[in-house]
């Protein structure tokens, strides 16, 4: 007797159902579809949220640092999620905090400020949270330019911005120069809780795409939820068809609402 209802869909890694972090069949095909939609070199699914993706991002940054004889130092905005700190502790990474020019919560980091930090600290990577917890979006394009100038990786916690790629203007970290980012699909897309993406950008060293799955597997459960994976897969045709238009219409309604609020004296 089904207790919740979806039990018939609650598969596990059996023959024909593929293996999430050694994907060769249906999961690999679905992830390739997602990569095409997000314009990435590689996209890997997570059934354990962006928390898992953040650990994998830092592990890949550590491998890159070792390969390039750099110290295991990450420069990070001080508003980073707690999983960033626990992952850094687990991997024995040193953190150099970057404090925002306005507040710790918004942690607005300027390109000039980032340049100073990179020159003084020589980090292996820079870690930015954007959008932040108030909805503010960092100037990823300008920060990326600074990172590329100094050959430093740019990692972005885009947990609250999976939808950004599907707006009319380029706003997603993968469109603006980030090297690796994570999206919590379950936060801003109709995906079950825990569904997330690890994205690897075009132009990054091949090692990142080659090691992405093993980096995820290092921290992940060997029993991923196939219900979550199916919801990620079901999202692909929606992203490819009606979602961008729906998102555009929603953004237009929000613009109208903001104009009304400003007209009534509210500061936004």
Q: How does the language model describe each region?
A:
Residues 7-52:
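Conserved N-terminal alpha-helix of the aminotransferase class I/II PLP-enzyme fold
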Residues 37, 43, 48-267:
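Conserved PLP-enzyme active-site core in the AAT-like
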Residues 1-6:
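N-terminal glycine-rich, Lys/His-bearing helix-loop that initiates the first secondary-structure elements
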């Amino acid at each position: 007797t089904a207790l919740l209802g979806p039990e018939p869909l609650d598969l596990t890694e059996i023959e024909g159902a593929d293996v999430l972090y050694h994907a060769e069949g249906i999961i690999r095909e679905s992830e390739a579809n997602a990569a095409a939609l997000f314009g990435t070199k590689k996209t890997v699914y997570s059934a354990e949220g962006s928390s898992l993706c953040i650990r994998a991002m830092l592990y890949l940054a550590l491998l890159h640092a070792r390969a390039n004889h750099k110290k295991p130092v990450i420069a990070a905005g001080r508003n980073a999620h707690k999983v960033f700190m626990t992952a850094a502790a687990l991997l024995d990474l040193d953190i150099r905090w970057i404090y925002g020019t306005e507040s710790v919560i918004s942690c607005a980091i300027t390109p000039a400020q980032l340049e100073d930090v990179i020159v003084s600290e020589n980090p292996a990577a820079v870690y930015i949270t954007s959008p932040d917890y108030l909805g503010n979006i960092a100037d990823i394009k300008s920060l990326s330019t600074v990172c590329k100038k100094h050959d430093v990786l740019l990692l972005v916690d885009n947990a609250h911005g999976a939808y950004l790629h599907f707006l009319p203007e380029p706003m997603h970290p993968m469109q603006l120069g980030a090297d690796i980012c994570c999206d919590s699909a379950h936060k801003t897309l109709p995906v079950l809780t825990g569904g997330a993406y690890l994205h690897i950008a075009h132009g990054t060293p091949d090692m990142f795409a080659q090691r992405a799955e093993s980096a995820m597997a290092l921290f992940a459960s060997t029993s991923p939820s196939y219900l979550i994976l199916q919801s990620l897969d079901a999202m692909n045709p929606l992203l490819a068809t009606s979602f961008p238009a729906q998102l555009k219409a929603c953004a237009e309604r929000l613009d109208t609402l903001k104009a009304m609020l400003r007209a009534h004296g509210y500061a936004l």
